[in-house]
């Protein structure tokens, strides 16, 4: 439960480690140390901070980009790895919460992952991006409804989304309905397709982060990364595709529940920390005017259904557990098991749980 009235937070704007996990872990710990030296309680990293965003899938044909696949897979983060334990131990040693963005390696697949590690080194939750964006689907698998999660911490109720999940109204509402107080908004660099697609720009996506705060009456900590010349060299960006990815693209910010920016922006090609003090009492003022999952909602007109049924790719069935069912009576139109439906407290979000 929340015990702090003021939370000092840091949003990272820095260059990712260019598909080098070991170097990335070192940099993660160093940035966490810098944030703690500034008195921060929480540090937030951008989308796929480890081992870096897979820009290669946007820069050429799928057959061309495959040459990066093995390296990217090998340097992605497993949550049961020594690398992850190093970061968790650093959180404990430094006494800081770490909201991490990473390419998660699980078995033979990758997922766009995020997790929250508390100041005791315990992972409070991990989640996966529900639907990777466009060509990201050639790299990453999908998440589940259970990944729309908000957890109670001493900092407040904390949840997270990745990148263009902030353009998904239903996913946002699922978090609003869990009374999120601090929102983690993980973004990559905004230097991709800067001349071709305004929707990918920092201007548009920082506006999405800002409106998230206003809609949800929460603090939004938006973290991003910076593309360097070393990144361009690694990805063989040359005359044929120079306009597709450029140096810079950083845009990190912390927004108040009324949409105010709480610190100055850094230059787009600069590395550093955006730091602000979050006065948690501001949430009550914002909620008094607009609470879309409370007094400003109309559940009899519109409501969200969150289906928490989880489907594994394999189900083990033992013969002794198989029960032969009697044939249904002629008048029975459906043999489907009933679905349990519950409504979250003080919310117009329905939770649907499949029968076990």
Swiss-Prot record:
EC number(s) stated in the UniProt entry for this protein: 3.5.5.1
Record field: catalytic activity: a nitrile + 2 H2O = a carboxylate + NH4(+)
Pfam families from the UniProt entry: CN_hydrolase
Positions of region (Disordered): 324-356
Keywords recorded for this protein, A-Z: Hydrolase
Chain ranges of the CN hydrolase domain: 7-280
Xref: Gene3D superfamilies: Carbon-nitrogen hydrolase (3.60.110.10)
Record field: compositional bias (Polar residues): 332-356
Top-level EC class as recorded in UniProt: hydrolase
Active-site feature positions: 47, 129, 163
CDD domains, per the entry: nitrilases_CHs (cd07564)
Molecular function GO labels: nitrilase activity
InterPro entries given in the database record: C-N_Hydrolase (IPR003010), C-N_Hydrolase_sf (IPR036526), Nitrilase/CN_hydratase_CS (IPR000132), Nitrilases_CHs (IPR044149)
Record bears the keyword Hydrolase: yes
Subunit and interaction comment: Homohexamer.
Protein family according to the UniProt entry: Belongs to the carbon-nitrogen hydrolase superfamily. Nitrilase family.
Function summary: Nitrilase that acts mostly on arylacetonitriles.
Name of the featured protein: Nitrilase, arylacetone-specific
Higher taxonomy: Bacteria, Pseudomonadati, Pseudomonadota, Betaproteobacteria, Burkholderiales
């Amino acid at each position: 439960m929340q015990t702090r009235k003021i939370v000092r937070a840091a949003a990272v704007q820095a260059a990712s480690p260019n598909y080098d996990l070991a170097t990335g872990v070192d940099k993660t710990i160093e940035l966490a140390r810098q944030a703690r030296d500034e008195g921060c309680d929480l540090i937030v990293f951008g989308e796929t901070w480890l081992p870096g965003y897979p820009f290669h899938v946007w820069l050429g044909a799928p057959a061309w980009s495959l040459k990066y696949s093995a390296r990217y897979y090998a340097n992605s983060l497993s949550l049961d790895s020594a690398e992850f334990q190093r970061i968790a131990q650093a959180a404990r040693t430094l006494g800081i919460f770490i909201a991490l963005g990473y390419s998660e390696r699980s078995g033979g697949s990758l997922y766009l992952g995020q997790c929250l590690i508390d100041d005791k080194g315990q992972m409070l939750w991990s989640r996966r991006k529900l639907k990777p964006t466009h060509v990201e689907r050639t790299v990453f698998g999908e998440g589940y409804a259970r990944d729309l999660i908000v957890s109670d911490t001493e900092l407040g109720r904390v949840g997270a989304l990745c990148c263009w999940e902030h353009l998904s109204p239903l996913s946002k509402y699922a978090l609003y309905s869990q009374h999120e107080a601090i929102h983690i908004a993980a973004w990559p660099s905004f230097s991709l397709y800067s001349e071709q697609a305004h929707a990918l720009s920092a201007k548009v996506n920082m506006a999405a982060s800002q409106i998230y705060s206003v809609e949800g009456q929460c603090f939004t900590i938006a973290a991003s990364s910076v593309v360097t010349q070393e990144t361009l060299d690694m990805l063989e960006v040359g005359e044929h595709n120079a306009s597709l990815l450029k140096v810079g693209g950083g845009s990190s910010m912390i927004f108040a529940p009324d949409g105010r920016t709480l610190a100055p922006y850094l230059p787009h090609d600069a590395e550093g920390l955006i730091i602000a003090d979050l006065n948690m009492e501001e949430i009550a003022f914002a909620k008094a005017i607009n609470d879309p999952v409370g007094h400003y909602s109309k559940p009899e007109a519109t409501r969200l259904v969150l289906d928490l049924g989880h489907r594994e790719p394999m189900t083990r069935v033992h013969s002794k557990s198989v029960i032969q069912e009697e044939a249904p009576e002629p008048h029975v139109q459906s043999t489907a098991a009933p679905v349990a439906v519950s409504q979250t407290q003080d919310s117009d979000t329905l939770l649907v749980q499949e029968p076990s």
